[in-house]
Design a protein with these regions (language model features):
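Exposed alpha-helical structural elements
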Residues: 16-19, 23, 112, 136, ...
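Helix-loop junctions and short alpha-helical segments
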Residues: 41-47, 51-143
Length: 208
């Protein structure tokens, strides 16, 4: 596994997610009908939610796989390196080091990622960049949880996020509607806002 491949896969998934949102907006706004089937609000919402999950999982996968690449001593895309404090014999050994006594390593938890990075890399390598987007990362997790979970707590967390971001809680607002809203004071949607954050993070982490 090479960091360049990990990077390209992540960027490709981000691009795919964006294309899905663009396509569903085009179909929905033009009331597309095929063989009597209308491109409904439900279909539109499912596609947007699915696109966001694709984006989030692309970032999660990138964080884990890039971490393994750096543990194996690979340089960044720019050729720069940083010191590592471990020398795993292979990727499986590296993954076991990350997991420790746990069943898996949670690469959706910024605190865990940064702690591991500080344990394994000099000054945390490039993963300290996550500290600069800690708030955005948590917001994305709240949206992810609201899409994939049905708990009262995940719904409350999402509603709190909506209030914080737009100053009110529109009746019956769901994740897809929020993601398709224009960010106050900006010209892009919340989906594009989070996509840009992910792409920027991928680039920064890939280039020490």
């Amino acid at each position: 596994m090479q960091l360049l491949d990990v990077y390209n896969d992540a960027i490709r998934d981000c691009t795919k997610a964006t294309a899905l949102v663009n396509s569903t907006n085009e179909f929905y706004n033009n009331s597309v009908v095929s063989n009597g089937t209308v491109y409904s609000t439900d279909i539109h919402s499912c596609v947007i939610d699915g696109a966001f999950l694709t984006l989030f999982m692309a970032f999660e996968r990138f964080l884990e796989l890039s971490f393994l690449c750096y543990m194996m001593g690979q340089p960044g895309l720019n050729g720069n390196t940083f010191a590592r404090f471990v020398s795993p014999v292979n990727e499986e050994n590296a993954l076991n080091m990350i997991k420790g006594n746990n069943k898996f390593a949670d690469f959706t938890n910024r605190d865990i990622i940064v702690r591991l990075a500080n344990n394994f890399f000099d000054a945390g390598g490039t993963y300290t960049y996550l500290n600069s987007i800690s708030g955005d990362f948590e917001e994305m997790k709240k949206i992810r949880n609201a899409i994939s979970h049905v708990s009262i707590e995940s719904k409350k967390s999402f509603q709190g996020l909506v209030r914080t971001k737009i100053g009110s809680l529109p009746p019956n607002i769901d994740t897809s509607t929020f993601l398709n809203m224009i960010v106050p004071g900006a010209s892009t949607t919340f989906f594009i806002h989070y996509k840009d954050i992910v792409v920027s993070a991928i680039g920064n982490i890939s280039n020490p």
